[in-house]
Amino acid sequence: MFSAKAKTYELKLEQTRCNGDWQAIPEVARKLHKHNSSKSFVCELAKIEASLKSALTAELKNIANVLEPKLIDNQYSLIPALPSARTDPLLSQLNSLNIQNATEDEKLQETSIRLLLYIVQRKFPEAVDLDWSPQGIPWTETSTGICILQATVLSSLAQYAQANDEVAYQYVRSAIGLIQNANIGKKPLPELTRWCDLAYSLYAQMSVSACSSQLERANILTTCLSYFTEHKSVNLLYKLVTSRQAIKYLEHILRTNTNGSKIFTKSPVKNLYLNWPQLVLDYGSLLCNFTSFPKAGDQNMFAVEFIELATSIWINTEKSYDITVSLIRMLYQLTGKCFQAQQIFRSLVFFLRHIEEFEEASEAFEIYKFLCVKSHERLARKNSDVAGSFSDIKPVFVDEPKSIIEVCSVMMTVYAQYLRNLKKVSEILDYITKIASDYDLLKRDDIAPLIYHTEGVAYSFMYYQANNPSLRERYHQKSVQSYQKCLEKQPTNTNALFHLAMQYSERRAITDAMQIVRRLLEVNPKYSIVSWHLLVLCVSCSEQYAAGIKLIDSVFETWGINHVNEDGTIEISLTNLTFNDRCALVDLLITKLALFEAEKGVEATLDIQDEIFTLFASIFDLNEYRISKEGSSDELSTLLERSTIQSIKSSKKISKDVENEKGSILGFSRKSSLKRSTVLSKKSHSSYKENFQLRRGKTVSYLNQKLWLTAASLFLKSGNDDQARSALLEAKKIDHECAWVYYLNGLSLLQQGKEVEGYEQLDVAHYLDPEDPLISTALAKCLLQGGYGPMHSRRNRADAILSSCTLQYGWDLPEAWYYTAEIFRQLGDLKQAAFSYDYCIQLADTNPVRRWSNLQPRFMNV
C-alpha cells in the first residue's frame, strides 16, 4: 500500500499536467517519485513534457509579435519549431525510458510526447511512421485523454506536412469527433482547451481543400465558430485562424453569388451571412490584439488582407449605416497598428463617402494619395540602376494603378458634387492623367472607361465653374469627348450617359440631350428620378408642358406615388426609395407646378399646390428628422410634427400681421442655420449618427422652405400679396438667412409700388447670395428701372452685376442678357446690344421651366 502522500502527489501531478502548470511539475514529480518509486516512468515523462511545453508556451507568446504569413497559411506552423539544442536532449531522455514497464496509459502519453518532439523538430516522416490511431481507445477527461487528443491532432499536422491532405483531414475529423463525443463543458481543463482550440482551427483550415461542396464547408466553419463562441480560447491565435477562414469563405460566397442565390437560404450559409458584421469586427479586434506595435512591410499582410476582405463583403451586402460606422472605427484602430498601409485609407474613403462624411473622406484621401506617391517613388528607385543604395527600404504594399484610379473617381465626385472644390478637382485630374500615362492605362479596357468618365466629370465641373466664355466652351468640348470615349468602350454605362445628357442640356444642345437621356432610360428605366426630371425639363424647352406633366405622372406611378383617395387619404409605397430619391421627388413636384403654371396659368396651379405639401409630408417620415438648433437660448431643438401639417389653403386665412411660428407646416425653429463645429477624425458612433441626422434634417428643412417659396411666388404672380407674405413668413421661420426670402419679399414690395423698400430687400438678397443669377438679374432690373438716385450710378452698378452674372452662373439666363442689351442700348453701343438681344432670344427658345441647377445630384458616383 502506498502512503496518503503518494496518492496526494499522484493526484497533484495529474491536476498540474491538466492545468498546464509546467513550472510546478518538476517539484511535484520529484515528491511523487519519492513517495512512490513505481511511478518513475510517468514522473520522468511529465518532466520531459513540462520542459518541452514550457519552451513551446514561451515561443507561442513571441508569435504575437511576429505574425507572419507562413504561421497561418501552414497548419503545422501553429506548433512552433524549437532549436535542436533544446529538443535533442529531451528526445534522448525519452528514448532512455524503459517503456516495457509502462502501463497502457503511460505508453499513450509517451507516444503523444514523442509526436510533439518530432513536430517541433520538423521530423515529419518520423511522426508519420509512428502510425498513431485513436480508434478503439476509450477517451476520458484526464491527462491520458488529453494526450490521446494531442496525438490525434499532431498526427494530422504530420500528415499535412507530408502532403497527405486526405489522411490529415481524417485525423482532424477524428479529433473533432473525440471532442464532441466527450461532451466537454464550457470550462474544460486549460491543457485540454489548448488542444481543442488547435483541433478546431485545423478543422477550419483544412476545410478549404477537403470539402466537396461550399455548403459542407459552411457547416464546418459554423461548427468551429460556435465552439470558439462558447469556450474561452487559451491562445487567441487559434481563434484568429478560424475567424480568418470564415471571413475568407464569406467574402468568396458573396463575391461569386448574387444576393438572390439559393445558397444564401441554406442554414449554415445563411447563419454566416446574417452574422457577417460581428464576424468581421471580431476578427479585426483579434488582429489588433495580436499586433502589439506598428507593423511595416510584409507584417502588414493580415491587416491588409482583413481590410480587403471586409471591404469586399461590405460592397456585396446591404451597406447599413451602423455597420459602416463600426468598420470605420475598426480601420482607425488599425491605423495605429500598421505602417504605410494604403488599403486602410482607401477603404476609409469608401466608407466615409457612404455615410456622407465628405470632409473626413477628403482627409483620408489626402493621406492615401501621399502614401501612393511615396510607395511608387520607392518602387521606382528600387527598379533603377542605383537600387542598391536603397536596400534599407522596407517592402510596402503598393496599390495597383486600377485601385488608385477607382479611389480618385470616388473623390472626384465628392469634390465636384459636395465640396465644390475646384482646386482638388484639378489636382485629381492631373494625378490620374499622370498615372494613366506612366502605366499606359488607356490601352486597358478594364480601366480606360473609368479614366475617361472621371476626366469628363472634372471637365464638366470646370465648365460649370468657368467665368470665361472661351474657356467654358473648351471645357465643354473636353467633357463631351471624355464621356463619348467612355461610352465607346461601355455603351450602357448609365452614369456616363446621365453626365453626357446633363452636359448637353446645360449647353442648350437640347436635341442631343434628349437623345442621350432617352437612351439612358431605355437601358435602365429606373436609373434615377433625376434622369426622368432631366427629360421633363428637356421637353419643357420646346413648350411641351402637357407632355412633361404626363411624364411626371408616369414617374409617380413607377416609383409608387399614388393619387389622393376620395376620402382625402393618400396611398404611398416608398419602401424601396432612398433618401435622395425622396428629395428628387419633391423637386419633381415643384417642376410639376411650374409646368401647370406654363400650361394652365397661375390660378389653376394654386388649386393643386396644396397637394404638394400633403405629398411632401407623406414622402418623408417627419418624426424621423429631429435636428438640434443653435442660437436659441430658450428652444434648442424642435420636432417635425406630423399632426401640425397644414395645407397651403390654410395659409390664405393667415392675416398679414402674423409673426409667430404657429401654422408652420413642419414646425421648424425660427433660426435653422447651423454652425458645424470642428470634430476629430475619429468620431464616436453617436457623433457620426448625430451629424448624419442633422444633415438629413437640414435637407428636409431646405425642401420644406423651397415649397413655401414656390407658394409665395405663385401668390405674388396672382396678386395675392397677403398670402404671399404669409408663405414668406413660414419660409423665414425655417431659415431667416435664406436669400430667396428677401428676393421674393422685394418683388412683392415692388409689385405694391414700394420701390425703395423693394430695392433694399433685393440688395439684402444679393448680399446673402451674390452668385444667384435670378437675384442678380432682378436687382439689376430694379436699378435700371428705379427712379431714385443718379441714373449713371444705378446703371454702372447694374452693369457690374450683370457682367459678373453673365460670366458665371447666369450665362444661360435670357433675362440677364436682355437687361445687358438694355444697358448697351442706353450707352449707344448698338452692336453689343444687338448681340445681347440675339443671344437672349436664342436662350429663350430653349429655356426650361426651371433651371438645370434644380437637378441634384448633378454628378453621380463614377
From Swiss-Prot:
TPR repeat windows: 342-377, 460-493, 494-527, 665-698, 705-738, 740-772, 814-847
InterPro entries: Endocytosis_PI4K-reg_protein, TPR-like_helical_dom_sf, TPR_rpt
Keyword Repeat carried by entry: yes
Gene Ontology biological process: endocytosis; intracellular protein transport
SMART domains: TPR (SM00028)
PROSITE patterns, A to Z: TPR, TPR_REGION
Subcellular location: Cytoplasm
Entry's transmembrane regions: none
Keyword entries, A-Z: Cytoplasm, Phosphoprotein, Repeat, TPR repeat
Chief subcellular location: cytoplasm
Residues bearing the modification Phosphoserine: 632-633, 637
GO CC aspect terms: cell division site; cell tip; cytosol; plasma membrane
Function: Involved in endocytosis.
Family the UniProt entry places it in: Belongs to the YPP1 family.
Protein's name according to its UniProt entry: Putative cargo-transport protein ypp1
Source organism of this protein record: Schizosaccharomyces pombe (strain 972 / ATCC 24843) (Fission yeast)
Lineage of the species this protein comes from: Eukaryota, Fungi, Dikarya, Ascomycota, Taphrinomycotina
Gene name per UniProt: ypp1
